[in-house]
């Protein structure tokens, strides 16, 4: 996709809080004039340790958090975690999908790529440890973006989403940890399971956690677990 123009407007909002969270809202106009705002978190030692490259995690929210109010993005997932954990060891980027789009749309996928490119260019990101995760609509977006750019990510964590079976051959070398609730009636567990089975048949690096008694919210337990972040950090992609 050829980018016709790129208007980059960056507003930095610094706040002092218990979690030492630094937040930035970005209004980023690209092809088709998508305004993409996001929450941005830097680890507490980012400025004091000037020689470290930091892992980055991209979080994609669900359908109900679309719109133009960034407060909605803070309700679930990574934005909620960074408010609670002082020592969260990732740069965290949590964009908000405009109401008229979903994450799987081609224009949104391009907007996410452009957003990550800007972050990598302007911050000390360890390019061997860039991860993508999302829930529900964001779970679908995680599958799609990982398939679009498997060269960019070191691992992916789609939660209660689903993917395109045609992309399995592209994804088979990417470490993927899939989560779903066994009683999910919004996005059926089969949406995750068909991708897991196909990746297993292809020899993929996939693992699957099914919460037998969970409904659609299979993300709270997932993002609350230190094991998730340990697993992410254990995965690096080869140097370019």
Model-derived features: where do they sit?
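Bacterial Sec-dependent N-terminal signal peptides
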Residues: 1-22
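A domain-start/cap signature at the N-terminus of enzymes
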Residues: 17-56, 133-135, 140, 145, ...
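Gly/Ser-rich "nucleophile elbow"/oxyanion-hole loop immediately N-terminal to the catalytic nucleophile
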Residues: 44-52, 100-137
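Active-site machinery of serine-nucleophile hydrolases
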Residues: 56, 60-113
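Alpha-helical scaffolding within the catalytic cores
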Residues: 72-83, 160-169, 190, 194
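Short, proline-enriched alpha-helix->beta-strand connector loops that line the catalytic pocket
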Residues: 88, 171-176
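Primarily recognizes the serine-hydrolase "nucleophile elbow" in alpha/beta-hydrolase
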Residues: 117-122, 128-172
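C-terminal catalytic histidine-bearing segment of alpha/beta-hydrolase fold enzymes
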Residues: 159, 175-240
């Amino acid at each position: 996709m050829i980018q016709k123009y790129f208007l980059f407007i960056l507003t930095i909002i610094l706040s002092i809080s218990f979690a030492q969270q630094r937040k930035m809202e970005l209004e980023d106009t690209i092809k088709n004039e998508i305004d993409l705002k996001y929450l941005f978190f830097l680890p507490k030692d980012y400025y004091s340790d000037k020689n470290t490259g930091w892992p980055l995690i991209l979080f994609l929210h669900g359908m109900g958090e679309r719109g133009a109010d960034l407060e909605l993005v803070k309700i679930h997932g990574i934005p909620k975690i960074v408010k609670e954990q002082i020592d969260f060891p990732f740069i965290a980027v949590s964009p908000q999908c405009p109401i008229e789009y979903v994450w799987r749309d081609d224009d949104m996928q391009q907007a996410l790529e452009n957003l990550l490119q800007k972050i990598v260019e302007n911050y000390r990101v360890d390019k061997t440890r860039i991860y993508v995760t999302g829930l529900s609509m964001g779970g679908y977006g995680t599958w799609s973006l990982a398939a679009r750019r498997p060269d960019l990510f070191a691992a992916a964590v789609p939660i209660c989403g689903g993917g395109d079976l045609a992309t399995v051959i592209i994804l088979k070398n990417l470490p993927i940890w899939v989560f779903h609730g066994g009683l999910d009636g919004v996005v059926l567990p089969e949406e995750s399971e068909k991708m897991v089975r196909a990746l297993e048949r292809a020899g993929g690096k996939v693992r699957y956690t099914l919460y037998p008694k969970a409904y659609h919210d299979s993300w709270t337990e997932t993002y609350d677990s230190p094991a998730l972040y340990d697993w992410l950090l254990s995965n690096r992609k080869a140097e370019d």
